[in-house]
Amino acid sequence: VHNPYSTPGGWGFSDVNTMNPDVDDTTAALRAIRQAAAKETALRHAWDRANQWLFSMQNDDGGFAAFEKNVSSRFWRYLPIEGAEFLLMDPSTADLTGRTLEYFGTFAGLTKDQRAVSRAVDWLLSHQERNGSWYGRWGICYIYGTWAAITGLTAVGVPAHHPALQKAVRWLLSIQNDDGGWGESCKSDGAKTYVPLGDSTPVHTAWALDALVAAAERPTPEMKAGFRALFRLLHHPDWTASYPVGQGMADAFYIHYHSYRYIFPLLALAHYEQKFGPLDD
């Protein structure tokens, strides 16, 4: 609606939604077709159109939102509508901006030297929390946002020794549980501050590990403890395996994505082995 002059080219949330594309699902689809698009003309056209649409969705502030462009007026917050901030606004967020940067760097071969990418990097760096974390709008919550930001920034060439990344790493390590894993309560998004769950979840642990791997120059004891915790959680699943880590509206609507407990641990382990070799512990 707010980007009417762009050529359609995105993908939507679900296999039957062809009317409402969003940034995150578009980058997910582009990741999936990248190799085939290099060989098949029809897919190459889809790849090109989707990338053009993706760039057209960058907000004026440099970040990326989910469904709309430049819908971030604070006016909506003052309407007497419960949840107006989540229902009527679609501002730039750390999770969408970070995941888009990760796509640009890892799958599209772009770096922070490109202007659009540089603007997104600047937006992320200017929206880091004082404690080093980032708030994630569509997941739970600060672990999720910090994972998206770290992996996005490193993918486009921000060095691991950058002060913002090292501050984020220190924050992640400061909230690591005694069992080696990570877990965050859904209460975080309503409180607008990190609230520990009290137990580790496989998804939060995988997100934290993936972020640490991206920002590390070598394996660390904390990283290996995290993988040991992750393997325990996967081999002996309990209630934490189905704890919701997706968010629709703070304090009201949460989502359990059944595939997350498999996808993100696999990604974290694959990224570790690609960077450091086989996990020897």
Role assignments for model-derived ranges:
Residues V1-D281:
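Preference for long, amphipathic alpha-helical scaffolds in soluble/luminal domains
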